[in-house]
Amino acid sequence: MKNKIITFGEIMLRLSPENNERFTQCHEFEAVYGGGEANTAVSLANFGVDCGFVTKLPEHSIGQSAVNSLRQYGVDISGIVRGGDQIGIYFLEKKTSQRPTNVIYNR
């Protein structure tokens, strides 16, 4: 029997201004999916560890995009339940030498 690591948690959509801009300066955001447990599953998969992720995501195209982002790294997505209307979003203004990281959650 082969061992497998399963992570449980929320995957969120992260929106960040490009080019280290502030929220008040930007006109476009870079979109990336992540979250502590999802990031762990992706990291393990990158090291060749058999792993899966368990969560609930909406049936719409944003939910499917989150599923696809995990699948592309080789994470087993068979434990993902589909339903509901929303995915958590957070805005991340990246740290520079002059300012700290700024995070705003929208759940």
Language model: regions and residue ranges:
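N-terminal glycine-rich anion-binding loops that anchor highly charged ligand groups
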Residues: 13-16, 35-42
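Short, glycine/charged-enriched secondary-structure capping and boundary segments
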Residues: 20-23, 67-69
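Short, surface-exposed alpha-helical segments at coil->helix boundaries
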Residues: 34, 38, 64-67
